[in-house]
Amino acid sequence: MVDGCLMLFNLKFFKKKIFDENFFLYFEETDLFKRCLNKKIQILKLNTVNFSHKGRSSSDNKYKRKIEINRNWHYMWSKFYYNTKHYGYLYALKESLKNLISSFLKGYCFIFLNFNKREIYKARFQGCLNAILLKKSLFRPDINF
């Protein structure tokens, strides 16, 4: 697996933008690598290179819940968008229905038990539903720095 937090490019292979700007947070590198493979552009992974990436360390802890909700919303939206882009709407719909139903049911189950989990599953459901309805990925956390 190649992670998108550290990548180097030979820009001669890219006439337009490298990343699809419809993605936010998730599946950007998966989409890029899929497009590279489709164009027979070689991808190299160097197993001898090590680096430290402190994920989620740039934000204040007081925003942790809002950021987690944002992450879950965008994961579901981006997953559907990726599948639609590369395999078609019906395939994406088939792959996402179980996530949509599961998120709805889990959100309902946690309605009285755990507010934080309920909000997470609500975000997953809404992200998936927005993607199915072909709405843009416009959800952002309400954070004032």
List the predicted regions and their residue ranges.
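Residue-level signal for well-ordered alpha-helical scaffold segments within enzymatic catalytic domains
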Residues: 16-17, 35, 81, 85, ...
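Membrane-interface aromatic/basic loop that binds lipid-linked glycans or pyrophosphate carriers
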Residues: 115-145
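A short, conserved alpha-helix in the catalytic core of glycosyltransferases
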Residues: 1-18, 22-50
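Active-site-adjacent helix/loop segment of glycosyltransferases
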Residues: 38, 42-119
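Alpha-helical packing segments of well-folded alpha/beta enzyme cores
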Residues: 29, 75-79, 124
